[in-house]
């Protein structure tokens, strides 16, 4: 090679660039044929043409144009003159990998910066996008955060960005450019000065520091130096001389060398694991913020690990000031989001939280980029993630309880109470700062928390030597106190410490682990066993040694060079099938793809640690499906740790993922008012020794809400309920088999059957447990202003019990009162049944009609009368009684304006009650994760359909029995979970979900059906299981109860299996239905005994899961299992609730204080829907009356004054009714100041509670102080309005009622026509005043008035109806900020109570006739009693004062939409002169009292004590009524002076 020759830059057709020394094909000087030669030098002539001096094999030289040279195609045997060719020198180059994309550079900008083709060919699209994101912020001189999930290649994206900015090519050219400058000059190649000036600093944890260097060396030719260890001073000199391009250092070294590094000019600072910058007060945060570089790039997959303050800290480092100050961020984002995430949040809290979430996401969107693992789902195997709750051994329980009973723990628990010395300070800050040994409460708190964690894992851990003398002293004292009760254990520990530590009998988890390892060894599974505690790893290691298992161990003490050796041995050696790994030490940089079972022996407080541990095996390169088992000690502090993980992960989903995450908890981290079930020392130092599972209770509670929402959603999508849905009701009527194909499309439209949840049904072991679990929900739901109605408290059982005789006689439920349980959104089974029922007579003519068609009420009545209920195989009388008591009525939900507008209204019209054991449901197994899958309905003959059903559906078809009923009900519930994902990381195809779901519903006594199941994989997707509906909800937990509740044992929920473990099908079931399996990411309860469901493609995997299920089923210490895959994230039901909360609060400005779990329709939506539904049925020339469309929204301060008037004085003109909203708000604030209120909110509350006269006087005084002449016509305006509105309103009401009657009559039966007509009259009376679009008085403010209009009839007494200001803001400009107060919960309750006073008589009549809620509350004089059997049944006679039950019976005809009745404003005092009734017990909010309500005898006693004349007595003697008499008396008698009660309304109370 001639070093003086000019460098080649000419391009040829064969190759872009030629270099001296390269081999080529050149024309032979003899015959012109191409032959091999080598380039000696390259020259350029005078004309600019490039020539190469080539040297042939015979040493001849010849000058040939570069264009004639061609590249040599190497052959294996071809001799090489050079050691490396260009391909060998390319970086990166993975010869065994195919290029994912073409080998072209990826252009980032027009100035020439691009990702070199050597790197770009291995990148995926999302990685190029990430590189472009980093480059964009670098160009603009700002920072950013790359927040991709673990395993998506953040390191590669950064390297791509560096290669582009440093103009790397990944070829020989980079080698030449990296040569020293004197060599470059000798080659007559000038170094690029611009590139030389660029220098980047990468800060990373020590554990991954050298991994960064390896990656940089692999992916390109970078000049890298490592600033760490002994050589950091020498390397720092090189950095100062700018002899490197990239400097690598650690957080600690950066802190030590901050001044030196700040003296250099860095092009950008890149920080790996940026979530370390999470504490504003931490030293590492201060150091990072002190770096003098504006381009700060952070890399983290978990930017939010514990709270939102961490997010702010990281973002404030990368982009200072982006999210404001810490105080501003907490007020604007953190508090609203966290409070809106509460399970008991109000609509305003939820809507405000979601709005804050969206604002935060919008604010961060340009500076924060996050992608999830769904991008690489096709490269990852399946993951089965399960929580395994292990019962403690008796010895563990005793020790755990003993620790909690120590004096120190008592001191901790009482530390926050007021000191006994009455100083006003807390005990821990006054007389009880330390214990008798001088240890502070804080020290004791942390020490005893550690002790409880040790006992929950293995009692022998208390005997282990501690790391510090203080800890050792404390542990010794605790052991002396605790083990004084167990001398045998202490003696054995001294004599045989090794044996004690390795003996599983001292730990419930160890017993489970022992059988798990044996199971994995048989199946040749390789197990990664993680533990956070190294002391616990010692115990596990000793167990492995005692068991003769070949294992490896890796923890923080393992040297770095040995780590890779251990990983390699474990992955490659078959004999080593267990590796003990420390959760923290093994969290980063380890690749255990050889393992397919991951066991987390103990949880950590930070969910990111556990996820990192799982990702050691579940990552790209894993060939087998991964099973993750997390062991949790039941009822201990570990359960709180896991639930806090869920809390943090849900918060991460909201803030980082901008998802409407499910709201499981009532707790808010850092809030003393909302410690809920998670936070506070009382939750940590608690032991649930009865075997109950807090996790199960919380997930079930959320599942009930979700199920109710989604069930209502299905109803709301079904259209006008005017037609029949053909479905045979009789249990022995055979289903037609030729309709499978026709039924398939109905899968998308049928009702969602996975929400058959009933709070009144027994949970776990006893029915009393249910009451205890649900009572707190009731009280917390009413924590917002408003008292729960009996509708929300599950009151239907009492009414149903009294009507049992009628039900048994004619198959029709006479009582039409219904309940939706404590959870307002939880619907009973019949709600779904009603949407899916078919008329038996129509079976032969039409098999599967559209689900828009609902059985006509008249036809239902006739049908039920002619049908005999078949009570099938009830095991005992107590069972029958319990089943009847658990029956509920359905709540048919209203229809909204679109399919996505799904709401739940607590008071809607109902369908008839269904006979037991008659309906079968067939939920389809097909469904995508993003679309709601609903379910069709079928029936089948119990006697004749066994063969066909078995072959088609793969279920056990026997004659209906408690066992079989239970099986089918459980199958049905689990079968509906196909809408959910299989993994929080991965989307699973529909077929996989089908198989997995079926495989997870297995029972011990159904092996005989497995062969049949393997015959129909295709049919299963279409025709799935047929299930019992009523038994489904009756036996949601088990139909087969024994005489003692305590003996009921369920495999997953029987927490004391030693004494209760019957091996029967009925008792070996798991109740997945308690969780909302309909939703995308919901938790599911995993049954113990799997039932095979075959598909050839995944049969091996299913067998693997079945094998694991079978193993877990046989472990006695496993108390409860649930899948962790669908717990985290959002759901469709939560999306509905969030959307409607925002709609109600921000658009309609109403219902803001209702619980967020209740969705409410607007009158606008209702009107549009009713117009669409009613118009086709209207006769020619007849329009639907306005009164029949409007809703009776009862508000305590309605606005009736809607006239627009103008008053003229000498110099001033006053316009009434057209005040702009801005002026209204402004003058309302002035009014608050005028009346010396401390705030606008206080003034709004004062107005709400003030009497009519007080409000009138306040308005007059305020405006008269500015305009004295206002006082003259102020009152006249009101009185004028009152008179005209009363007269005209009554006339218009009657006209509209007549129209509505003629409109509805053709579709109703005789009795229904009459009752509906009355309801129409009543509705019209409420809403007819809406026609008078009188505007509010405008004195540069919005003045509104209110009146109560009484409609009296000579024969029938009507209720006082308060006309409301029109909610439809499009109709009335007065729907403004002022009206929000009138929509507040207290106001609504007040008016509703006024209405109730005068409706007692009609309510009695209604109750006697047993009319459903499709029928009205008010009756005309010509009432007809449809069912004489119930004529003498009076709810008033049963309960006493039943006026509070008004909304139970309130209905508005066949209208598809109905606003809910408002809950009461608060608990009311019981009158002294009457006995305690049902409502008094509910007001006590006492778990014990509420649990009594499940006892039929108690309810009967209450009914007997109830006074009969209470409602009439109230009218005569208000002072002795249910409510106290005072200035704020809710049912105050009407007087003309009340018309001045219309004060200016504000949105403050909302």
From Swiss-Prot:
<dbReference type="InterPro" id="IPR038718">
    <property type="entry name" value="SNF2-like_sf"/>
</dbReference>
<feature type="region of interest" description="Disordered">
    <location>
        <begin position="1"/>
        <end position="23"/>
    </location>
</feature>
<comment type="similarity">
    <text>Belongs to the SNF2/RAD54 helicase family.</text>
</comment>
<comment type="subunit">
    <text>Interacts with NEK6. Interacts (via an atypical PIP-box) with PCNA; this interaction facilitates cenrtomeric localization of ERCC6L2. Interacts with CYREN; this interaction is DNA independent. Interacts with XRCC6 and XRCC5.</text>
</comment>
<dbReference type="InterPro" id="IPR049730">
    <property type="entry name" value="SNF2/RAD54-like_C"/>
</dbReference>
<feature type="modified residue" description="Phosphoserine">
    <location>
        <position position="983"/>
    </location>
</feature>
<dbReference type="GO" id="GO:0016787">
    <property type="term" value="F:hydrolase activity"/>
</dbReference>
<feature type="compositionally biased region" description="Basic and acidic residues">
    <location>
        <begin position="1389"/>
        <end position="1405"/>
    </location>
</feature>
<dbReference type="GO" id="GO:0005813">
    <property type="term" value="C:centrosome"/>
</dbReference>
<feature type="short sequence motif" description="Atypical PIP-box">
    <location>
        <begin position="785"/>
        <end position="796"/>
    </location>
</feature>
<keyword id="KW-0158">Chromosome</keyword>
<dbReference type="InterPro" id="IPR001650">
    <property type="entry name" value="Helicase_C-like"/>
</dbReference>
<dbReference type="InterPro" id="IPR029256">
    <property type="entry name" value="Heliccase-ass-bd"/>
</dbReference>
<dbReference type="InterPro" id="IPR002464">
    <property type="entry name" value="DNA/RNA_helicase_DEAH_CS"/>
</dbReference>
<protein>
    <recommendedName>
        <fullName>DNA excision repair protein ERCC-6-like 2</fullName>
        <ecNumber>3.6.4.-</ecNumber>
    </recommendedName>
</protein>
<feature type="modified residue" description="Phosphoserine">
    <location>
        <position position="980"/>
    </location>
</feature>
<keyword id="KW-0347">Helicase</keyword>
<keyword id="KW-0378">Hydrolase</keyword>
<dbReference type="GO" id="GO:0036297">
    <property type="term" value="P:interstrand cross-link repair"/>
</dbReference>
<dbReference type="GO" id="GO:0004386">
    <property type="term" value="F:helicase activity"/>
</dbReference>
<dbReference type="InterPro" id="IPR014001">
    <property type="entry name" value="Helicase_ATP-bd"/>
</dbReference>
<keyword id="KW-0597">Phosphoprotein</keyword>
<feature type="compositionally biased region" description="Polar residues">
    <location>
        <begin position="1359"/>
        <end position="1388"/>
    </location>
</feature>
<dbReference type="Pfam" id="PF00271">
    <property type="entry name" value="Helicase_C"/>
</dbReference>
<feature type="domain" description="Helicase ATP-binding">
    <location>
        <begin position="135"/>
        <end position="321"/>
    </location>
</feature>
<dbReference type="InterPro" id="IPR000330">
    <property type="entry name" value="SNF2_N"/>
</dbReference>
<keyword id="KW-0234">DNA repair</keyword>
<keyword id="KW-0137">Centromere</keyword>
<dbReference type="GO" id="GO:0000775">
    <property type="term" value="C:chromosome, centromeric region"/>
</dbReference>
<dbReference type="GO" id="GO:0032991">
    <property type="term" value="C:protein-containing complex"/>
</dbReference>
<keyword id="KW-0206">Cytoskeleton</keyword>
<dbReference type="Pfam" id="PF14773">
    <property type="entry name" value="VIGSSK"/>
</dbReference>
<feature type="compositionally biased region" description="Basic and acidic residues">
    <location>
        <begin position="12"/>
        <end position="22"/>
    </location>
</feature>
<dbReference type="GO" id="GO:0003677">
    <property type="term" value="F:DNA binding"/>
</dbReference>
<feature type="compositionally biased region" description="Basic and acidic residues">
    <location>
        <begin position="933"/>
        <end position="953"/>
    </location>
</feature>
<dbReference type="GO" id="GO:0005634">
    <property type="term" value="C:nucleus"/>
</dbReference>
<dbReference type="InterPro" id="IPR050496">
    <property type="entry name" value="SNF2_RAD54_helicase_repair"/>
</dbReference>
<dbReference type="GO" id="GO:0005739">
    <property type="term" value="C:mitochondrion"/>
</dbReference>
<feature type="domain" description="Helicase C-terminal">
    <location>
        <begin position="512"/>
        <end position="662"/>
    </location>
</feature>
<keyword id="KW-0227">DNA damage</keyword>
<feature type="modified residue" description="Phosphoserine">
    <location>
        <position position="1373"/>
    </location>
</feature>
<feature type="region of interest" description="Disordered">
    <location>
        <begin position="1354"/>
        <end position="1410"/>
    </location>
</feature>
